[in-house]
Each structure stands twice: as structure tokens, then as C-alpha cells.
Amino acid sequence: MLVIFEGLDNCGKTTLVQMIKDYYLKLGIDAEISKEFETNIGKELKKMAKEGTLDPILKAYLFATDRYIRMKNIRQEDLKNKIMLFDRYVPSALAYRMAEGVDKNWVTNINSVFPKADIGFFIDIREHSKINVNIF
């Protein structure tokens, strides 16, 4: 089962996804987390994104490449036999790239190779309630 979690940066998605995984594991249900920036391309993408030097079109391709590599590492039987929890997925690609002025249909097209989520959750939190993870 493919379950996705979306929401603003620092809204608690990663913490929530980890808690859900732990809960499933306690119940004896196999669960795994996948999130952006875990592949080699993803790690480089994170560095470049922090520098702010990436063109929005290139970002769309690189995020899709990172997602593609992560999906290639997931066997089809895993999608049937375990809970796959994604901390960000295609909706984030659409939201971020459209906010940068990239055409919705174009972004949708390059992400059309990815399976549709079985269920998705959007963590809706007020801006002032976001978790401050940059304390130090």
C-alpha cells in the first residue's frame, strides 16, 4: 500500500510518518519510509537547492529522478505486502514547481510514471504553529 504525507516544511510530517511506521511495526505489519534526498542524486539536489542556484525546470527533473530511483528500489510486491509511507510525493512536485511558475501539465507529465497513492494525507497546520527545527 502506498501512503503519502504532504504539508508545509517543518509541520511535523517526518515525525508523524516515523510514529506511524513504529505503530504498524508494533502491530506486526511491515512498513517502510521513503523520503526525498536519500539517494545520491537526492543528496546532491539538497545541497544545490540550499544554494538556491537551481533552475525550476532542472529541479523538476532532479526531484523526479530522485523519486524514480526510490521507486525502482521498491518491488511491486512490496506495494502489495507492506505499508510504504512516503514523506512527500508527486503532489509536492506539483505544488513547488507550480509556485515557481512551471506549467502544471508539464510537471504532471514528467511525474506520470509514478504509481498513484492508495491514500494521501495533507498535514494542515498554521504557519505560526510550525515546528522550529532550526533552533541552533
Regions found by a protein language model. Name each.
Residues 1, 82-83, 119:
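The start of beta-strands in P-loop NTPase/AAA+ ATPase cores
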Residues 3-5:
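Hydrophobic anchor at the beta1->P-loop junction of P-loop NTPases
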Residues 10:
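Walker A (P-loop) phosphate-binding loop of P-loop NTPases
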Residues 13:
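Conserved lysine of the Walker
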Residues 16, 20:
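Hydrophobic positions on the alpha1 helix immediately C-terminal to the Walker A/P-loop
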Residues 23, 29-112:
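ATP-dependent small-molecule kinase phosphotransfer cores
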Residues 58, 135-136:
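Short coil/turn segments at secondary-structure junctions
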Residues 86-89, 113-134:
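Conserved phosphate-donor/acceptor-positioning beta-strand/loop module used by diverse small-molecule
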